[in-house]
């Protein structure tokens, strides 16, 4: 039986429903929009598929687990209990970053430090090392703490998905490509009619509309 993953897709505020609609069109299951993010479930094969085809989401994060934590001890123990060795190899680099909102553990640098220590303890025990080399591939660890509920994730995207790679140079005050794609989606443009943006600036919205019309990732 194929393994099922929980994905967390960060989204710009106000376009979560648009991201959710796109995920449903891409065939993801149990799609649920929340403030600033959309949750869904899929298979390992969906990881590259989402990173290639998702137009409106910011990143594709793989959720490894969640728990309640009001103290640093609870944060440490909860993180150390997760099977990090299933995802991070012996030489993997695993920096930690994230945010905390409306929680007892409000210091982000302190949470980063505690989580790093928890991962080092778990991985060091599994691999039989006192000090992990961290000389290999990058495995960016992300955390969110919202009202004392901790979610730990791995970033599968690298650069944010708004960095499409089609610009030879940046223009002043650019519109993010993910937001432009969301605006085109909200306009219900499907590529069959003419598209006009009289105040197109650096052309982000028409470019995203053209990609949708051509069905290009």
Describe the predicted segments one by one.
Residues 46, 102, 149, 158, ...:
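Short loop/turn segments at secondary-structure transitions that flank enzyme active sites
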Residues 167, 175-217:
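Conserved S-adenosyl-L-methionine
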Residues 110-112, 158, 210-214:
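Short, glycine/charged-enriched secondary-structure capping and boundary segments
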Residues 99, 146-185:
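Class I S-adenosyl-L-methionine
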Residues 140, 149-151, 192-195:
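Beta-sheet entry/capping signal
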Residues 35, 154-156, 199:
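Glycine-rich, histidine-containing beta strand-loop boundary motifs that form or position
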Residues 2-139:
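Non-catalytic nucleic-acid substrate-recognition regions in nucleic-acid-modifying enzymes
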């Amino acid at each position: 039986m194929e393994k099922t993953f929980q994905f967390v897709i960060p989204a710009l505020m106000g376009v979560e429903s648009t991201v959710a609609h796109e995920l449903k069109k891409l065939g993801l299951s149990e799609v649920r929009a929340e403030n600033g993010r959309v949750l869904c479930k899929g298979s390992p094969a969906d990881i590259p598929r989402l990173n290639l085809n998702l137009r409106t989401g910011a990143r594709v994060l793989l959720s490894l687990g969640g728990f309640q934590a009001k103290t640093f001890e609870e944060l440490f123990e909860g993180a150390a209990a997760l099977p990090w060795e299933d995802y991070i190899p012996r030489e993997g680099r695993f920096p930690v970053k994230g945010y905390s909102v409306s929680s007892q553990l409000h210091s982000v640098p302190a949470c980063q430090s505690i989580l790093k220590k928890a991962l080092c303890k778990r991985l060091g025990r599994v691999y039989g090392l006192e000090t992990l080399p961290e000389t290999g591939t990058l495995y960016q660890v992300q955390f969110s703490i919202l009202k004392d509920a901790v979610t730990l994730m791995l970033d599968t995207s690298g650069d944010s998905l708004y960095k499409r790679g089609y610009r030879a140079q940046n223009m002043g005050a650019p519109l993010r490509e993910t937001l432009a794609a969301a605006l085109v989606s909200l306009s219900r443009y499907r590529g069959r009619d003419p598209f006009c943006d009289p105040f197109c600036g650096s052309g982000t919205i028409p470019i995203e509309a053209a990609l949708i019309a051509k069905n290009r990732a």
